[in-house]
């Protein structure tokens, strides 16, 4: 397990807000395999989606939803009900390819050829809404980010919702292209373009085997180990996925840092102190 700690504004206050990363999963798929992923069998132990639910979904939504299903499938017992959970979807540049193709089609063939699905499926909120509706989660759901700072904005939004909403937990879903694909004249991307999704389930709890710490500007560092942080360190989504996997395997070397534009530090590392408490 992992935990999240939001350091308090007052340096004299020793209590933080802690959340487990109760489960997480990463899914990567090349563009050529995403059509099959829309209709792929669900992971053993994961809930099913309505038939053809992802038929018109953007690639970010397909990969992000699959990451959530994988994380649910590996959720440790006892698995909670997710009915009241919130969802934060934080994609980086979603809907770009479909939007480009639509604009080209509009210019060439007129408005009658434009699909009505383009607006709801390519909006910033499409990912979060699909997870919430498809998996019957009735907590707040919101799309955040959409650009290069999607990770930082996703983390701070998620912790804000957990701190100020009466919800038992929250799914935070990040998506991005491994390398943002270059489209051809028809708006088509290379078939080997790789889309990545990382799903993280956050729940209030005690410390786990690792921790994810957000230190706000002007606050004290959570521990001496946090003094290692450097303003130049900016962890990527791929590195976050690797750190989460390492923490789940008990790797004491796991250490990931992302410095937000406004100065907050987001860090995940193995929590050796929690090992001693077991």
Residue ranges of each PLM-predicted region?
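Conserved "HGTGT" condensation-loop signature of ketosynthase/thiolase-family condensing enzymes
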Residues: 1-94, 98-124, 128-143, 149, ...
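Internal, well-folded beta-alpha domain core
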Residues: 153-160, 164-166, 195
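Short glycine-aspartate micro-motif
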Residues: 170-172
